[in-house]
Amino acid sequence: MSKVCQVTGRKPTRGYKYAIRGIAKKKKGIGLKVTGKTKRRFQPNLFKKRIWFAEENRFITLKLSTAALRTIDRLGVFAVVRKMRANGQSV
């Protein structure tokens, strides 16, 4: 599964894209009506990030979401990597 955050586990979710027509009620119209609905995927905001791992004196490359990057800033790289390894992921 390529579009999965290695830290938080965020992955694509499914949803719909709605086609609407009409004039909104606050513009004195009859309201917006749904005329169609198409399936779509909501992609997580992922990117590859190269992070210096000082405890092992090397860089590690992780596929992260923005929420995971904030988690790493808050907890530190060592705590996050320790939790990942406890869950069986290789880093």
Curated annotation (Swiss-Prot):
Gene Ontology MF terms in the entry: structural constituent of ribosome
InterPro entries according to UniProt: Ribosomal_bL28, Ribosomal_bL28/bL31-like_sf, Ribosomal_bL28_bact-type, Ribosomal_bL28_sf
UniProt key word Ribonucleoprotein: yes
Keyword Ribonucleoprotein in annotation: yes
Ranges in coiled-coil conformation: none
GO cellular component, one term: ribosome
Keywords: Ribonucleoprotein, Ribosomal protein
Residues annotated as signal peptide: none
Protein origin, superkingdom: Bacteria
GO-annotated biological processes: translation
Family classification: Belongs to the bacterial ribosomal protein bL28 family.
HAMAP family registered for this protein in UniProt: Ribosomal_bL28
Protein name as it appears in the record: Large ribosomal subunit protein bL28
Gene that produces this protein: rpmB
